[in-house]
From Swiss-Prot:
The lineage of its organism: Eukaryota, Metazoa, Chordata, Craniata, Vertebrata. PANTHER family: ENHANCER OF POLYCOMB. One of its GO terms (cellular component) is site of double-strand break. It is found in: Nucleus; Cytoplasm. This is Enhancer of polycomb homolog 1. One of its GO terms (biological process) is positive regulation of DNA-templated transcription. Transmembrane segments: none annotated. It comes from Homo sapiens. GO terms for molecular function: chromatin-protein adaptor activity; enzyme-substrate adaptor activity.
Length: 836
């Protein structure tokens, strides 16, 4: 203490402190005389502040040690007492509460708003409380968000609705009050701010900065891993807590909406009671006039009942929505253990319409929500229904990973076991289409020989023919059918089958069913298909083999009286061998040569007829008739032997196209005439033209009015009969009573390969042309394309012209050559033919 001057040193904890006894201490007045030579430090204040009254008093009081304690002054601001204002704020009677304010030590402090409510705001909040539910803290939070969300320019009302998660009416009231108060405020913001240090370093020496940033220090050690783990745990905890807060907020909004709905329902019931609307008529009228509102979520509703996973359309009018917990859980937790599906009840119980229970209301996908997933309290029973199949069930399923599983968002209907059908091949009475293309036929295989039941053919990959089999109740009967009996003729089928059934089984009912099936098959009530291979006959080298167009059931019929029959020349073989032929290269070449020779002879005959037409009418008619008869009969004699064993058929679609392509026009025949050498193998569409009726030839008659005459008896349809070509007199016996002596000459031409048409040049002949056109079976013509029939009619179905006393230009027709209409029906000059 002897040194009068010393400098301030930092305290050293290791240095021992001196110990003084009481008698060694100097007196108090001696301390004042000690001059402590401490350098004067700058105060950091301005000169005006240093001379401030309170500051100078505090400095002087600190320097005065010898004065008494009463003279020492602590500088405090001067206070004014207002007792009336104090008593208005604090009540006079104070009672000690039973429990003081208790704060948990480790609780999270809620973030308090920076805006403080003033007196003007308190008046506004008390006034707004009467209309809406609001508290002072909620008002402070709303103003704080509006202030922090807007900078120099205040936010708009739409932006305020995005910032504030409140009702629109409350947001509008608070926003208008805030805008009004902000305009009256002179400062930039309603929240007072403390001056802080600027980041650019310009306020380093500013003494009015209240809070300064800490000096950045170099970090000498790394962060530990446990700090990162703790931080991640805190983030997870914050997320979980925020999710809980969001759930509570949503529950609060839901309960508030329920309360408003209850008030509205009560109000509606009171209005209906006052109006006397006890039966709901007024209510239904109002609902009909109301415009339909679009749903909030345009997602399909999935109705699910507790008793079944299926639902019908009767219970689809449900108007409430719920959140699908399953979809949100799948997004957050990709791996979850699926619960086992509840067992599906039988379809009989599922097919009955059931009322929707409150716990089975439809659900919707809530992926559009920006909040966390929030399950409803009454949605737990649906979790089992919506959950997928378990892993054990996948292992037990025979389909494995390809097993059928219900997909969320899809609606499934219960199957109807009482309706077995809806297939295209079933009859319309069973709910099908009855389409012929999908029909099944009784099918027999050759290797091994057995009947496989009902099947249908279709072409697979590579042109392979596949058989689709169909199950029926008679499959056990079909497998026991005798193949030899199916191919045998239809005489005493029951007796033949009785012997077979005795060897197979002794059941009488089985025998009866099988015999009835055999009768149906042989009577063509059931279609039977059996694959066959064509056989080659080389017994006669001079005969020409011919190829059948289609193997189908032979149909025979009789022509009705009053119609003229167009017959084919066929001969039946005496041998019992099969009637299947195939072409060889030599036979095909001989056949082409004969056809070309026939065409050349027909050209010569036509030119001879035209040359002799200028002479007398009767002589030309007889001469042309005799020449045609002799010429055609001579040429057909070589073809009669090739047609043995064939049965005539009516014209179908493929036969009509083949016949149309095999016939030629008059222009083509005239082109053949101009050539000196006949070129073999020339035809239309790759097929050699056969002999036929030529275009440009006309009929003549003595009575023009007879052209449109048609007998009613000839309207019926008839099948064409095969007959010998030499029996021409018998084929025209039905028309012989109509031909007069003057016009008895007939014209015979060959249509196709082996079809002969005999046309008398008389009035009766003209009368019989229309029945020829209408004589086809309607079922056969319906399957023929109109284009093929038009082509055959326009090119080849006109007969030769024979002059007479009164000539007519043409056969009754619609002048198809001039108008060229759409080929959508059968022409009047189409002649029915038979193709074998």
């Amino acid at each position: 203490m002897s040194k009068l001057s010393f400098r301030a040193r930092a305290l050293d904890a290791s240095k021992p402190l001196p110990v003084f006894r009481c008698e060694d201490l100097p007196d108090l007045h001696e301390y004042a005389s000690i001059n402590r030579a401490v350098p004067q430090m700058p105060t950091g204040m301005e000169k005006e502040e240093e001379s401030e009254h309170h500051l100078q008093r505090a400095i002087s009081a600190q320097q005065v040690y010898g004065e008494k304690r009463d003279n020492m002054v602590i500088p405090v601001p001067e206070a004014e007492s207002n007792i009336a204002y104090y008593e208005s704020i604090y009540p006079g009677e104070f009672k000690m509460p039973k429990q003081l304010i208790h704060i948990q030590p480790f609780s999270l402090d809620a973030e308090q708003p920076d805006y403080d409510l003033d007196s003007e705001d308190e008046v506004f909040v008390n006034k707004l409380k009467k209309k809406m539910d609001i508290c002072p803290l909620q008002f402070e939070e709303m103003i704080d968000r509006l202030e922090k969300g807007s900078g120099q320019q205040p936010v708009s009302l739409q932006e305020a609705k995005l910032l504030l998660k409140e009702d629109d009416e409350l947001i509008r009231e608070v926003y208008e009050y805030w805008i009004k108060k902000r305009k009256n405020c002179r400062g930039p913001s309603l929240i007072p701010s403390v001056k802080q240090e600027k980041r650019d370093g310009s306020s380093t020496n500013d003494p009015y900065v209240a809070f300064r940033r800490r000096t950045e220090k170099m970090q000498t050690r790394k962060n530990r891993k446990n700090d990162e783990a703790s931080y991640e745990k805190m983030l997870k905890l914050r997320r979980d807590l925020s999710r809980a807060v969001t759930i509570l907020e949503m529950i609060k909004r839901r309960e508030k909406s329920k309360r408003e709905l209850l008030h509205l329902t009560l109000e509606i019931m009171e209005k209906r009671y006052n109006l006397g609307d006890y039966n709901g008529e007024i209510m239904s009228e109002v609902m009909a006039q109301r415009q339909p509102m679009k749903p909030t979520y345009a997602i399909p509703i999935i109705p699910i009942t507790n008793s079944s996973q299926f639902k019908h359309q009767e219970a689809m009018d449900v108007k409430e929505f719920k959140v699908n917990k399953q979809d949100k859980a799948d997004l957050i937790r990709p791996k979850r253990k699926y619960e086992k599906k509840p067992k599906v009840l039988p379809s009989s119980a599922a097919a009955t319409p059931q009322q929707t229970s409150p716990a089975a209301l439809p659900v919707f996908n809530a992926k559009d929500l920006n909040q966390y997933d929030f399950p409803s309290s009454d949605e737990e029973p649906l979790s089992q229904v919506l959950s997928g199949s378990s892993e054990a069930e996948e292992d037990n399923d025979p389909d494995g990973p390809f097993a059928f599983r219900r997909k969320a968002g899809c609606q499934y209907y219960a199957p109807h076991l009482d309706q077995t059908g809806n297939w295209p091949w079933t009859s319309p009475k069973d709910g099908g289409l009855g389409d012929v293309r999908y029909r099944y036929c009784l099918t027999t295989l050759t290797v091994p020989q057995r009947c496989i039941g009902f099947a249908r053919r279709r072409v697979g990959r590579g042109g392979r023919v596949l058989l689709d089999r169909a199950h029926s109740d008679y499959d056990s009967v079909f497998h026991h059918l005798d193949l030899e009996m199916l191919s045998s003729p239809q005489h005493s089928p029951v007796n033949q089958f009785a012997n077979t059934s005795e060897t197979n089984t002794s059941d009488k009912s089985f025998s009866k069913d099988l015999s009835q099936i055999l009768v149906n098959i042989k009577s063509c009530r059931w279609r039977h298909f059996r694959p066959r291979t064509p056989s080659l006959h080389d017994s006669d080298n001079d005969e020409l083999s011919c190829r059948k167009l289609y193997r189908s059931i032979n149909r025979t019929g009789t022509a009705q009286p009053g119609t003229q029959t167009c017959s084919t020349s066929t001969q039946s073989k005496s041998s019992s061998g099969s009637a299947h032929f195939a072409f060889t290269a030599e036979q095909y070449q001989q056949h082409q040569q004969q056809l070309a020779l026939m065409q050349k002879q027909q050209l010569a005959q036509i030119q001879q007829q035209q040359a002799n037409s200028n002479s007398s009418t009767n002589t030309s008619q007889n001469l042309a008739s005799n020449q045609q008869k002799s010429g055609f009969r001579l040429n057909i004699q070589g073809l009669e032997r090739t047609l043995q064993g064939f049965v005539s058929k009516t014209l179908d679609s493929a036969s009509a196209q083949f016949a149309a392509s095999a016939l030629v026009t008059s222009e083509q025949l005239m082109g053949f005439k101009m050539k000196d050498d006949v070129v073999l193998g020339i035809g239309v569409n790759g097929v050699l033209p056969a002999s036929g009726v030529y275009k440009g030839l006309h009929l003549s008659s003595t009575t023009p009015t007879a052209l449109v005459h048609t007998s009613p008896s000839t309207a019926g349809s008839a099948l064409l009969q095969p007959s010998n070509i030499t029996q021409t007199s018998s084929s025209h016996s039905a028309l012989s009573h109509q031909v007069t002596a003057a016009n008895s000459a007939t014209t015979q031409v060959l249509i196709g390969n082996n079809i002969r048409l005999t046309v008398p040049s008389s009035v009766a002949t003209v009368n019989s042309i229309a029945p020829i056109n209408a004589r086809h079976i309607p079922r056969t013509l319906s399957a023929v394309p109109s284009s093929a029939l038009k082509l055959a009619a326009a090119a080849n179905c006109q007969v030769s012209k024979v002059p007479s006393s009164s000539s007519v230009d043409s056969v009754p027709r619609e002048n198809h050559e001039s108008e060229k209409p759409a080929l959508n029906n059968i022409a009047d000059n189409t002649v029915a033919m038979e193709v074998t």
